[in-house]
A protein has these predicted regions:
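Residues immediately within or flanking Cys/His clusters that coordinate Zn2+
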Residues: 7-9, 28
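Intrinsically disordered, low-complexity terminal tails
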Residues: 1-3, 7
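Short cysteine-rich clusters marking metal-coordination/redox-active sites
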Residues: 12-15, 31-34
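Short linker/helix segments within small regulatory modules
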Residues: 21-29
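Juxtamembrane amphipathic/hinge helix adjacent to a transmembrane helix
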Residues: 244-263
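Charged, low-complexity helical/coil segments in non-catalytic cytosolic or luminal regions
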Residues: 4, 41-244, 262-269
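Cys/His-rich microdomains that often coordinate metals
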Residues: 19, 38
Length: 272
């Protein structure tokens, strides 16, 4: 049975972002949205349901920093001085409420081959995806929201959730509230996900054949209708030449999202 816990909510006076923490503390807080530093703050306490399980991280803050540095090093034409703009202290960890959907899908397809022959077939597959359980746009930076809306799920990473596993003294550890039901999330995104998986499976089956008037009819059977989980992510923002850039990774370091500056002079020199 899910337990409830008291979370601390702080509204940033600079950008009005609502920041949610597991614990109350006294040190300086940095807003991950606008980077405003708050020395004094008034926290509001809210009751929230805690999930029974979470995706346990396999990298820590240092691992995230190494992943970010290595990724940028491997990208062509990244300015050499970009690392001077990255503040190693401005790395945030956030445990996002997400819903887990698992099940199987089947798809029947038909079409006309290159020789006018009628073609048809059946395919099936498994699905295991995580969807963000928060639809309130002001709660998260846009880049983080876009990245975490839907992600594949790693079954091996699940553990029982205990708030004691989280560092109560770290102001860079955040969470956010669940604001939408599992049924509403699946109604909003489930059909799109099923259609995408079905099309990919059918195209894999068809291979290089040319098929006209392709019709795809998928059905899905869920064995997990949206189990609530906490899923950790790391993210960092930095400014270079007055432009903001970000680097985001899941707690396993398997899924990344980032943008980065490009040295245009170096890039144009190589092209020429």
């Amino acid at each position: 049975m899910e337990e409830t816990s008291k979370l601390q909510v702080l509204k940033c006076p600079a950008c009005n972002a609502k920041l949610t923490y597991f614990f109350e503390f006294d040190q300086v807080i940095t807003c991950p949205v606008c980077h405003n530093r708050m020395n004094s703050h008034v926290l509001q306490t809210v009751e929230a349901h805690m999930p029974l399980r979470y995706v346990s991280p396999t990298i820590d803050v240092d691992g995230f920093k190494h992943l970010m540095a290595q990724t940028l090093v491997d990208i062509d034409f990244v300015p050499c001085d970009v690392f001077q703009a990255i503040d190693a202290e401005e790395v945030f960890c956030i445990y996002l409420p997400m819903y887990l959907y698992e099940g199987t899908y089947q798809v029947a397809w038909s079409g006309i081959g290159s020789d006018q022959q009628q073609l048809n077939g059946n395919a099936k597959g498994k699905l295991a995806y995580l969807y963000l359980a928060n639809d309130r746009k002001g709660d998260l930076p846009k880049e983080l929201r876009d990245f975490t809306t839907c992600l594949p799920y790693d079954a091996e990473a699940l553990s029982s959730f205990e708030a004691g596993h989280i560092d109560a003294t770290d102001s860079h550890v955040l969470t956010t509230l669940s604001t939408i039901t599992a049924e509403a999330v699946w109604k909003k995104w489930g059909t799109k996900l099923t259609d995408k998986l079905a099309k990919s499976t059918v195209h894999d089956q068809i291979g290089n054949q040319k098929v006209r008037k392709l019709k795809i009819s998928p059905t899905v059977e869920l064995t997990n209708l949206g189990e609530p989980l906490f899923v950790p992510f790391y993210f960092s923002y930095y400014t270079y030449n007055n432009h903001r850039y970000c680097f985001i990774a899941d707690g396993q370091g398997k899924h990344l999202s980032y943008n980065n500056p490009i040295d245009k002079r170096e890039s144009s020199y190589v092209r020429n």
